[in-house]
């Protein structure tokens, strides 16, 4: 077995014991007494349903459970966002603003959690450089996100078909994205990181870099952060349920936003791609991806198992009734966040004060931890 194969096998083995799937509703046993929770989301404007169910509702649950001695840091990953170029500065600034409004709208309490802009805390970038001296090209090449964002072709079984020409076109920032993500997490000595399924591979790399640093400098400095996966499976596009819901989808009817009006939500769900296999509604992501996506959405919102939702919708025998039920569930869930978003988006001074307060606390911790890292490394 080569050294590279041994490292990859070790990472995979340890990953199993450092991932926890969040319950439908977190309880006080989810975190230990001095836990530090860290998570960020890219600024793409007002959050959509996938952002909400796949990430930020867990943040809200954690705020409700926070105990003295625990720390929550949630942020806007604006440095990560520019790994895909954002040439319109004014629009990007607007998206950053809307991201903060969305974080508060879903229920994150700024009295319990620090809300930050990644770019405003320079220690993120410096630790990125320090960790990049430990990260091998082989491990980074194994990451899938740079391949998906570079539109690398995939085989029928989902493997990426990478050639030298493809690699030569990849921007360095996108390729090293996972190292910056590791720096974001380790800078605060985070113990728990809520992420979606598509980010779990990056948390493997984060733990690997933490262990490598600790072993190299013979210090137990960085904890191995636990991956907290949301209970809801990935929310998919309403029109193309083979890919995840995304604001960049050219078909706006594919995405449900927090600030969508009830009539818009109902229209989008009625137009959602389903099938003609049966007028009985059951969960089968391969044969019935559209129907399964709608069942998954209801499961996430209601915090019920897929099996329970399938039983609930068994009373419907036509698509209109089924889809109207899904619409009602979504409309009711987003009623509060929609109202709160409209309130916060019109309070820029308050949003600025929330971020400034959060960054003051985060900068203090970031500065202390980076100073300790400098001392360990001999700077």
UniProtKB/Swiss-Prot annotation:
Its EC number is 6.1.1.2. GO terms for cellular component: mitochondrial matrix; mitochondrion. L-tryptophan binds at residue 184. It is an enzyme of class 6 (ligase). InterPro entries: aa-tRNA-synth_I_CS (IPR001412), aa-tRNA-synth_Ic (IPR002305), Rossmann-like_a/b/a_fold (IPR014729), Trp-tRNA-ligase (IPR002306), Trp-tRNA_synthetase (IPR050203). GO terms for biological process: mitochondrial tryptophanyl-tRNA aminoacylation. A motif ('KMSKS' region) lies at residues 244-248. SUPFAM superfamilies: Nucleotidylyl transferase (SSF52374). The keyword Calcium does not apply. Its main location: mitochondrion. CDD domains: TrpRS_core. GO terms for molecular function: ATP binding; tryptophan-tRNA ligase activity. A motif ('HIGH' region) lies at residues 43-51. Present with 672 molecules/cell in log phase SD medium. This is Tryptophan--tRNA ligase, mitochondrial. It comes from Saccharomyces cerevisiae (strain ATCC 204508 / S288c) (Baker's yeast).
């Amino acid at each position: 077995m080569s050294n590279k194969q041994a490292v990859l096998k070790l990472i995979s083995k340890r990953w199993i014991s450092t991932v926890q799937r969040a319950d439908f509703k977190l309880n006080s046993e989810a975190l230990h007494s001095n836990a530090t929770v860290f998570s960020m989301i890219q600024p793409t404007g007002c959050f959509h349903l996938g952002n909400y169910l796949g990430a930020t509702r867990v943040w809200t649950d954690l705020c409700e459970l926070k105990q003295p001695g625990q720390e929550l840091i949630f942020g806007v990953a604006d440095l990560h966002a520019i790994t895909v170029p954002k040439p319109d500065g004014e629009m990007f600034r607007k998206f950053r603003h809307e991201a903060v409004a969305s974080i508060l709208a879903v229920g994150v309490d700024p009295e319990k959690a620090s809300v930050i802009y990644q770019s405003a805390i320079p220690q993120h970038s410096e630790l990125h450089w320090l960790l990049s001296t430990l990260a091998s090209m082989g491990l980074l090449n194994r990451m899938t996100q740079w391949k998906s964002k570079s539109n690398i072709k995939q085989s029928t079984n989902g493997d990426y078909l990478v050639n030298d020409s493809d690699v030569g076109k990849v921007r360095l920032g996108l390729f090293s994205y996972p190292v910056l993500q590791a720096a974001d997490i380790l800078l605060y000595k985070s113990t728990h990181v809520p992420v979606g399924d598509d980010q779990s591979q990056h948390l493997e790399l984060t733990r690997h870099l933490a262990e490598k640093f600790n072993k190299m400098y013979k210090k137990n400095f960085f904890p191995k952060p636990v991956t907290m996966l949301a209970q809801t499976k990935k929310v998919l596009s309403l029109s193309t349920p083979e890919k995840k819901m995304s604001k960049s989808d050219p078909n706006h009817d594919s995405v449900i936003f927090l600030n969508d009006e009830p009539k818009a939500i109902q229209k989008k769900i009625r137009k959602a791609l389903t099938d003609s296999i049966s007028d009985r509604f059951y969960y089968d992501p391969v044969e019935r991806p559209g129907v399964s996506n709608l069942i998954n959405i209801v499961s996430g919102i209601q915090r019920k198992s897929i099996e329970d939702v399938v039983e609930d919708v068994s009373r419907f025998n036509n698509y209109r009734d089924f889809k109207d039920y899904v619409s009602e569930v979504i409309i009711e869930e987003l009623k509060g966040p929609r109202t709160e978003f409209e309130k916060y988006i019109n309070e820029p001074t308050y949003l600025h004060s929330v971020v400034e307060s959060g960054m003051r606390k985060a900068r203090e911790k970031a500065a202390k931890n980076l100073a300790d890292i400098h001392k360990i490394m001999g700077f």
